[in-house]
Amino acid sequence: MRPNKDRRTEIILYGLLLIPLLFAAAALAQATEQAQGLAEITAALSVILNNPAMLRWCASTPKFLLAVLVLYPLAVYCYMLDQADRHPGAEHGTAKWGNAHTLNLKYRNAKQPAENYILTENVRFSTDSHAHKHNLNIIVIGGSGSGKTRFYVKPNALQLIGSYLFLDPKGELTRTLGRIMETKGISVTVLDLVHFQGHYNPMAYLETDEDAIKLAFAIVNNTKPKDATSGGDKFWDDSSVLLISALILYLMYEAPASEQNFSTLMYMILNCQVSENEMVENPLMMLFGELERRDQQHPAVLQFKSFMLGAKKTLQSILISAAANLYMFNSRKFAEMTSRDEMFLPRMGLEQRALFIVLPDNDTTFNFIATMLYTQLFDQLFRLADSTPEYNGALPVHVRLMMDEFANVALPKNFKNILAVCRSRNISCDIILQNIAQLKSLFKDDWEGIIGNCDTLLYLGGNEYGTYEYLSKILGKETERTKSQSIGKGSRGSSSDSLQTAGRELCMPDEIRRMRDDECLLLMRSEDPVIDKKYNLLHHPNVKYTPDAGGEPYVMPPDYMGDAVTITMDAVAAATAPEITEEMYEQLDYLEKHPEENYYENEENFSQYDQGD
């Protein structure tokens, strides 16, 4: 595409050219009146042009001037119209390499160097998105061993800008960054899903009925097998959501804070055995019956009545399905971890905090906890920014999510929309991937929308052809001059040379593959791409406080409690739920294979409560 030229400049230049043309027209008019014949007219015109003082107004001067004023603009218009469709030197593309130092001068915060993101060795990116009109969402792509943590995550964490959430496989970031962040006055909280240390209770953040239903959906959707997509599975999922949301709403409105946790939830499910005898009520039915007598429109009652529309056999199967969704809470350590909360998610937008979520790199069983935390963090921060008038819709402290292992943790269903609007709330996301294939697998047809909501892409290297091909394509084509030569042999030999233009990718896929290990490729919206050195971690002034430069690592004490809270788990909630029996699983399996027995006594009534996806 041809760069847009300033048409005003062109028009001014053509207008200035009109002045000598009008003078020449007036001179020609005078010459035609003074002389006869072409030779004499030419001689007279030459004399007048060489001596402008001799120019005089004559009878034919207006005609000549009018002709110029009509024909000249018409000629200029035709010429500009013709040139508009020509792209000299850019017939095949205008892609070209940018300069890292030029890019840095444009986007850095020179007055406050600490208020910059570190992209490459020579490029800094100001956190003031209003100054450069770019969002702060960044996609980082790099294969295993390309240095995503060393060359990008750690240097940016050491900038100590605002609050951070880290997904931390194996706990490396916690050990490296925890001590310096505490030293610099940043509150450090760790949720360790490897050693089950720290405490996070999703029920601590329930404020509305919608929050409770959303949490129930998150539990069911993130604890089922990834390949569970059949219609029967949807039936069980929706039914489980009805039951779990009813129980969560009951705890939210009726239980003390110490009992609002997953252990109590599991305990309630296991005390809801449905009998074939309709005259026999289980403890849970009695509990909700008492609540209904007090308030028939209680949200928990409405959800529970929707669940109870099912046939007895079906209800028992749904109970088993719901218990299966919560089976991990049978673990004493996991039940204890979720018994109370010390994450204090809204505070991340009010004061500098660092939250490390330590994940096992070889087991994704408990990664759904990170998913729920993601969902609730976005909800809490958006709500805080939007509901506090003095914040004007933006959090006072910037919150940055460093989403390593992005592909291994399920995301909120509306993540694409969150990414599009988080900038206005002073939130940014660093999406860290191994290759483009991971993004395509996660978002199917919407994967390009994720990249579209990130104004910066940093490629650190890898060994996946699809990524090479994608990058080569978006880098564009340049126009090259080629020289062709032909030589004719024989008694009358001849040769000819010709210059032509041809298009070539700015960087071919194989050239991207051969990038040096210490180089990276940076693409920013509206800017030419840059190849620069990866940032050297040892050049950062704060690295001396980390184990990478001989500093002391951060070690979580065995009795780690984070920001200690006073609530304790109720005796009922502390009880370890019994294991789900093999007989219960067999019954559920039988009903899944015989869907004709899975029915609600009143399908029309049930349909109005179907929550859908």
What are these regions (language model features)?
Residues 1-146, 150-152, 477, 488-489, ...:
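Basic- and hydrophobic-enriched, low-structure N-terminal and domain-boundary segments
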